[in-house]
Amino acid sequence: DRKAKARFLSKGGDPKQFTYQYPYSIGSLEKLEQNVQGLGSISFLDQLDGIIRSLPLIVQFDKKLYPTMGLEMVRVGAKQKNVYMELNDVGIKRISTRPYKINSDPNGIIWIKYKKSQKKQYISAGDVYDGNFEKSFFENKYVLIGASAQGLFDLVKTPLGVTIPGVEVH
């Protein structure tokens, strides 16, 4: 039974009325899930044109709330246990984990502010494994590990007219 690592607190209503619900979930290896500080969803919302412009910060599966990967990284990096949601009559107004406050749409969705992809931000897994990198490369940074091979089907279109690895969206 998968359980979110974040604790959700809300003021002004029940966020489950407004968050996107998914019918099923595919988790990581149980051993990994049990030994990490955070678990985040990596789901995208379907778009008619296939371009990813927005991302939910909180999703729902099996009547339980889960943060998306980006929000969970912020929470864990800030050494917080809680995610707070402020709601009004129309839905979610703000999502926060101290000291960060993020305004969202009523469904907890934010618009992604893309920037031009910078290859210098990448390092191959092979180089890490072989120790062929500057140790300072990872210092004081959030690190995402992902695959970018076309056959893995984790490439997404952005409003900038480019296709990027899905991990870069987070």
Feature map (PLM): residue ranges:
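Non-transmembrane functional regions of envelope-associated proteins
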Residues: D1-Y100, F138-H170
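Active-site Gly/Thr loop motif
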Residues: N103-I123
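Short gly/ser/thr-rich secondary-structure transition/capping motifs
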Residues: S124-Y129
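Short amphipathic alpha-helices and their capping/turn segments at secondary-structure boundaries
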Residues: D130-E139
